[in-house]
UniProtKB/Swiss-Prot annotation:
<dbReference type="GO" id="GO:0000166">
    <property type="term" value="F:nucleotide binding"/>
</dbReference>
<dbReference type="GO" id="GO:0050112">
    <property type="term" value="F:inositol 2-dehydrogenase (NAD+) activity"/>
</dbReference>
<dbReference type="Pfam" id="PF22725">
    <property type="entry name" value="GFO_IDH_MocA_C3"/>
</dbReference>
<keyword id="KW-0560">Oxidoreductase</keyword>
<dbReference type="InterPro" id="IPR030827">
    <property type="entry name" value="Myo_inos_IolG"/>
</dbReference>
<comment type="similarity">
    <text>Belongs to the Gfo/Idh/MocA family.</text>
</comment>
<dbReference type="Pfam" id="PF01408">
    <property type="entry name" value="GFO_IDH_MocA"/>
</dbReference>
<dbReference type="GO" id="GO:0006020">
    <property type="term" value="P:inositol metabolic process"/>
</dbReference>
<keyword id="KW-0520">NAD</keyword>
<protein>
    <recommendedName>
        <fullName>Myo-inositol 2-dehydrogenase</fullName>
        <ecNumber>1.1.1.18</ecNumber>
    </recommendedName>
</protein>
<dbReference type="InterPro" id="IPR000683">
    <property type="entry name" value="Gfo/Idh/MocA-like_OxRdtase_N"/>
</dbReference>
<dbReference type="InterPro" id="IPR036291">
    <property type="entry name" value="NAD(P)-bd_dom_sf"/>
</dbReference>
<comment type="pathway">
    <text>Polyol metabolism; myo-inositol metabolism.</text>
</comment>
<dbReference type="InterPro" id="IPR055170">
    <property type="entry name" value="GFO_IDH_MocA-like_dom"/>
</dbReference>
<comment type="function">
    <text>Catalyzes the NAD(+)-dependent oxidation of myo-inositol (MI) to 2-keto-myo-inositol (scyllo-inosose), and thus probably functions in a myo-inositol degradation pathway together with IolM, IolN and IolO. Has no activity with scyllo-inositol and much reduced activity (78-fold lower catalytic efficiency) with 1D-chiro-inositol.</text>
</comment>
Length: 334
């Protein structure tokens, strides 16, 4: 299967490099608006075609599927163009910051009978998959409380924060998707609170850098997500589910498993610091799954609807923070 990648920033580059490691895929074409970056990556990756105009890549008859990894504001236009060209499409999160655009992306890809796969890579982390299986199999009984800790080692640039849609649509959106995925049910109500504790410039940009979100699922189960834009000790990613028969917990990944014990106690290596280190394997598994879905004709493992639901939860959290009250999901679906 010949694949084209649009957007050669951090994520697009990781995906392009990963495609070179997948037997069932050929990285056939790349596109980026920066000509110098395009030339550099064409030579580095050894791809056949390089297009400055992403529409030329989409219209290339030799391209079977497209990875849209460009800036969020370009996603809807490019995904819809892929649908009209009958190309299966993988789109990085968020699908869009505009719910009407997301609906159109879903509608157009369905009409064209092509896959729309949303890039939520954390579902493909082997530890989180194991935790999901245990919850699904009833190992801990009926789930009562989900707790997700998701803290970045450092905030992104302010220019990025200003266009990101805010912490709930940029950062917590991963956790909203994981909450639905792990629990296997929908959220009906959201309460969010947040503060500016890391960098006052983030507040001036109209966002918070520290947040807690409480979720109420349709079964009555509860979820708690805590986020920070800066954890000085590294990339902090943990999930716990407590249920009627026990609990299951996925801890952080460290650089090594070596632990030194002396008169000062136990000392281990630090947590992985950068998200591309922590989730490198999950990005590869995510792409393998996309390719498998396309070749088999089965529904995407992470659908456009999944992307929409995470976005809705993000908007519910924003509304809750602004209005200082809990928000039912139906209030933002309309």
């Amino acid at each position: 299967m010949r694949i084209g990648v649009i957007g050669l920033g951090r994520i697009g580059t990781i995906h392009a490099e990963n495609l070179k490691m997948i037997d069932d895929a050929i990285l056939y074409a790349i596109s980026d608006v920066r000509e110098d970056r395009l030339r550099e990556m064409k030579e580095k990756l050894g791809v056949e075609k390089a297009y400055k105009d992403p529409h030329e890549l989409i219209e290339d008859p030799n391209v079977d599927a497209v990875l849209v990894c460009s800036s969020t504001n370009t996603h809807s236009e490019l995904v819809i163009a892929c649908a009209k060209a009958k190309k299966h499409v993988f789109c990085e999160k968020p699908l869009s910051l505009n719910l009407a655009d997301v609906d159109r992306m879903i509608e157009e890809t369905k009409k064209a009978d092509v896959i729309l796969f949303t890039g939520f890579n954390r579902r493909f982390d082997r530890n989180f998959k194991k935790l999901k299986e245990a919850v699904e199999n009833g190992t801990i009984g009926k789930p009562h409380v989900l707790r997700i800790t998701s803290r970045d080692p450092a905030p992104p640039p302010l220019d990025y924060i200003r266009v990101s849609g805010g912490i709930f649509l940029d950062m917590t959106i991963h956790d909203f998707d994981m909450a639905r995925y792990i629990m296997g049910e929908e959220v009906e109500e959201v309460f969010a609170d947040g503060s500016v504790l890391v960098d006052e410039e983030i507040g001036k940009a109209g966002d918070v850098d520290t947040a807690v979100v409480v979720l109420r699922f349709k079964s009555g189960a509860l979820g708690v997500i805590d986020n920070s834009r800066r954890a000085v000790y590294g990339y902090d990613q943990r999930i716990e589910v407590f249920g009627s028969k026990g609990r299951i917990f996925a801890d952080n990944v460290r650089e090594t498993t070596v632990v030194l014990t002396d008169e000062q106690g136990d000392r281990g290596s630090r947590y992985l610091y950068f998200f591309l280190e922590r989730y490198r394997d999950s990005y590869l598994e995510e792409l393998k799954t996309f390719i498998k879905n396309v070749k088999s004709g089965e529904p995407p493992a992470v659908s456009g609807e999944d992307g929409k639901m995470a976005l809705l939860l993000g908007y519910a959290a924003k509304k809750s923070l602004e209005e200082k009250r809990s928000v039912k999901l139906e209030e933002v679906i309309g």
